[in-house]
Amino acid sequence: MLYLIAEQLGFPGVLNLIRYITFRAGAAALTALFIGLIIGPRFIGWLRIRQGKGQPIRADGPQTHLSKVGTPTMGGLMILISVMLSLLLWMDLGNRYVWACIGVTLGFGLIGFMDDYDKVKKRSTKGVSGKARLLGEFLIAGLASWLIVSGNGTQLYVPFYNGPVIDLGPFYVVFAAFVIVAFGNAVNLTDGLDGLAIMPVVIASLAFFVIAYLVGNAKFAQYLGIPHVPGAGDLTILTAAIIGGGLAFLWFNAPPAAVFMGDTGSLALGGALGVISVVAHHEIVLAIVGGLFVMETISVILQVFFYKRTGKRIFRMAPIHHHFEQLGWSEPTVVIRFWIISFVLALAGLATLKLR
């Protein structure tokens, strides 16, 4: 909004700063951070009153989790409010990529909200059916992918290789939708401990802040041999807002958590990262940067597959963060070590930009 106003005025005086993506990104991060910190206490109090007993806790989970009974969920709404208000202020709302990303983020957030609401209402750990959720997610992701692809090409790029490896043509829409849905659910699976999911989301957003900026700059893209996507630079503002809103949420989600983000937040944030990677043509790099989320997802797939085939479990409990809890690791130990893994993987993902 401010960008369009300043543009109409010709960027006079101090408003010339708004012309620069880096300035707007920094402002977006701070705006989301302060909004989250300001609304947090009252919002959490309101959730606690409305939900009563809070998020249902799995009876078959680690016994230490029973102390979390009564903690409200749907804290992802707090993140979405702070991020969206920040975006409305600082993003170029004339950029269609912006609306594709906002659509996925809010759409996935709505599906997550419906799931959280169902769980709280039924006092059950099972919400909306998996098939209904996936159908809604693929419809949203498919529409966004079609909007992106219509002016962004259908080439697939992979790390360590200069230039596209294949043109997927119309199948790119299916591939892109799969990436968005898969990553949304991967973040959702990871959100099982206080602070576990949100910090890796912040770290991945920081990595894609760099990637989106480089992809959106013709000179940097040519120098690094990565795809140049005009307009993608504005997605740095979205990643910055997620960083700010995520850190504000972590203030209240740090152990012992005062609120859980729920599916409302995890699906929305995972979907946002997925669609950003599609716009930037760095979908494979997302699997490296967000490798922690991939690891959590694979642990669940392997657990289910081997249990159905052999009747035995590979892990004591899945997702894998619960396995380490069952081995005797304390919750903060699991969380911090997984943060470290996430940071290392983000650095590895960024390194692929130069190694070609």
UniProtKB/Swiss-Prot annotation:
<feature type="transmembrane region" description="Helical">
    <location>
        <begin position="220"/>
        <end position="240"/>
    </location>
</feature>
<dbReference type="GO" id="GO:0046872">
    <property type="term" value="F:metal ion binding"/>
</dbReference>
<dbReference type="GO" id="GO:0008963">
    <property type="term" value="F:phospho-N-acetylmuramoyl-pentapeptide-transferase activity"/>
</dbReference>
<keyword id="KW-0573">Peptidoglycan synthesis</keyword>
<comment type="similarity">
    <text>Belongs to the glycosyltransferase 4 family. MraY subfamily.</text>
</comment>
<comment type="function">
    <text>Catalyzes the initial step of the lipid cycle reactions in the biosynthesis of the cell wall peptidoglycan: transfers peptidoglycan precursor phospho-MurNAc-pentapeptide from UDP-MurNAc-pentapeptide onto the lipid carrier undecaprenyl phosphate, yielding undecaprenyl-pyrophosphoryl-MurNAc-pentapeptide, known as lipid I.</text>
</comment>
<dbReference type="GO" id="GO:0005886">
    <property type="term" value="C:plasma membrane"/>
</dbReference>
<keyword id="KW-0808">Transferase</keyword>
<dbReference type="GO" id="GO:0051301">
    <property type="term" value="P:cell division"/>
</dbReference>
<feature type="transmembrane region" description="Helical">
    <location>
        <begin position="97"/>
        <end position="117"/>
    </location>
</feature>
<keyword id="KW-0132">Cell division</keyword>
<keyword id="KW-0131">Cell cycle</keyword>
<keyword id="KW-0472">Membrane</keyword>
<keyword id="KW-0479">Metal-binding</keyword>
<feature type="transmembrane region" description="Helical">
    <location>
        <begin position="284"/>
        <end position="304"/>
    </location>
</feature>
<feature type="transmembrane region" description="Helical">
    <location>
        <begin position="241"/>
        <end position="261"/>
    </location>
</feature>
<dbReference type="GO" id="GO:0009252">
    <property type="term" value="P:peptidoglycan biosynthetic process"/>
</dbReference>
<dbReference type="InterPro" id="IPR018480">
    <property type="entry name" value="PNAcMuramoyl-5peptid_Trfase_CS"/>
</dbReference>
<feature type="transmembrane region" description="Helical">
    <location>
        <begin position="262"/>
        <end position="282"/>
    </location>
</feature>
<protein>
    <recommendedName>
        <fullName>Phospho-N-acetylmuramoyl-pentapeptide-transferase</fullName>
        <ecNumber>2.7.8.13</ecNumber>
    </recommendedName>
</protein>
<keyword id="KW-0961">Cell wall biogenesis/degradation</keyword>
<dbReference type="GO" id="GO:0071555">
    <property type="term" value="P:cell wall organization"/>
</dbReference>
<dbReference type="GO" id="GO:0051992">
    <property type="term" value="F:UDP-N-acetylmuramoyl-L-alanyl-D-glutamyl-meso-2,6-diaminopimelyl-D-alanyl-D-alanine:undecaprenyl-phosphate transferase activity"/>
</dbReference>
<keyword id="KW-1133">Transmembrane helix</keyword>
<keyword id="KW-0133">Cell shape</keyword>
<keyword id="KW-0460">Magnesium</keyword>
<feature type="transmembrane region" description="Helical">
    <location>
        <begin position="163"/>
        <end position="183"/>
    </location>
</feature>
<keyword id="KW-0997">Cell inner membrane</keyword>
<feature type="transmembrane region" description="Helical">
    <location>
        <begin position="195"/>
        <end position="215"/>
    </location>
</feature>
<dbReference type="InterPro" id="IPR000715">
    <property type="entry name" value="Glycosyl_transferase_4"/>
</dbReference>
<keyword id="KW-0812">Transmembrane</keyword>
<feature type="transmembrane region" description="Helical">
    <location>
        <begin position="27"/>
        <end position="47"/>
    </location>
</feature>
<comment type="pathway">
    <text>Cell wall biogenesis; peptidoglycan biosynthesis.</text>
</comment>
<feature type="transmembrane region" description="Helical">
    <location>
        <begin position="333"/>
        <end position="353"/>
    </location>
</feature>
<dbReference type="GO" id="GO:0008360">
    <property type="term" value="P:regulation of cell shape"/>
</dbReference>
<keyword id="KW-1003">Cell membrane</keyword>
<dbReference type="InterPro" id="IPR003524">
    <property type="entry name" value="PNAcMuramoyl-5peptid_Trfase"/>
</dbReference>
<dbReference type="Pfam" id="PF00953">
    <property type="entry name" value="Glycos_transf_4"/>
</dbReference>
<feature type="transmembrane region" description="Helical">
    <location>
        <begin position="74"/>
        <end position="94"/>
    </location>
</feature>
<feature type="transmembrane region" description="Helical">
    <location>
        <begin position="134"/>
        <end position="154"/>
    </location>
</feature>
